[in-house]
Amino acid sequence: MRYAICTNDPAVAADAREAGFDYIEVSVPSFVKPLEPEEAFEASREAYRDVDIPIEAANLFLPRELRCTGPDAVPMDRLADYAETVFRRLAAAGVPIVVFGSGGARKLPDGWPKEKADGQFVALLSRIGPLAERHGVQIAVEPLARVECNYINTVDEGAALARASGSPAVGVLADCYHWARNEETAGTILAAKDRLIHAHLATMPSRKAPGIEPYDFAPFFRALAAAGYDGRVSIEGGLPGPERRVDGLRKALDTLRAAHETALRG
């Protein structure tokens, strides 16, 4: 597996490289800046140019103002234009994965039927999937904890929507924190194995990097292994403080590797 931290700080990215991580995951608003001119994006790239660690994923695909479900969903052409900018810039930076969590943009208003939301969401994925494919980018739909978002909560649910898009560029992400908050089983990950393209994790209950509080990641890694997943895993949680960050990140990485080895041993 390849391990990363989520960060928008080049200094923290440099610490991750020193600690032995394989890549970093940034956010679309901070790094790609799709609502800003090209010069803003180039400045983002320049900020990371001297940090010797690749950027291989970007999260927070849609800002909350670009609603994609409900009666106030923005026009499809506007969403597609935004997505095209994101994919084009990610491709220019060599970033192959964009994470479609964006709970604020997809949360359903009271009374809006899930069936209508499914139709809206699949229509969007079907429209933007080919755009992503053309740029060599994959879209990872991220199921979120029910306490954070009321739409797309389980890994198998996300996979079903990805399949319905008809696009090979659309897959699903398994996030250990959300998966555990929702009390999912390994079965939801196994049911998504044909569309599983990315993973996140953090501790429960405090949503921290591994090693900061006790948490057993082995069940999550066993579920990933059962699904045949051996790809990228990004830590999306609170990181160690700056005083001993490199040591803390090394501990996080060691914790993950040990949990993975434990899972593989059964």
Regions found by a protein language model. Give the residues of each.
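N-terminal amphipathic alpha-helix/helix-capping segment at the start of soluble metabolic enzymes
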Residues: 1-4, 48
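Histidine-acidic metal/acid-base catalytic patches
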Residues: 2, 9-20, 80, 85-88, ...
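Short, flexible loop segments at the rims of nucleotide/cofactor-binding pockets, characterized by
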Residues: 2-3, 76, 149, 176-178
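Hydrophobic faces of well-ordered beta-strands that scaffold small-molecule active sites
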Residues: 3-7, 24-26, 55-60, 98-100, ...
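Active-site-proximal loop/turn and secondary-structure-junction residues that shape catalytic pockets
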Residues: 9-11, 28-30, 61-64, 104-106, ...
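Structural motif corresponding to the early beta-alpha repeats
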Residues: 22, 26-119, 235, 239-240
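Catalytic-core regions built around general acid/base machinery
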Residues: 40-51, 121-134, 188-191, 219-224
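Active-site acidic/histidine proton-transfer and metal-coordination neighborhood
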Residues: 69-171, 264-266
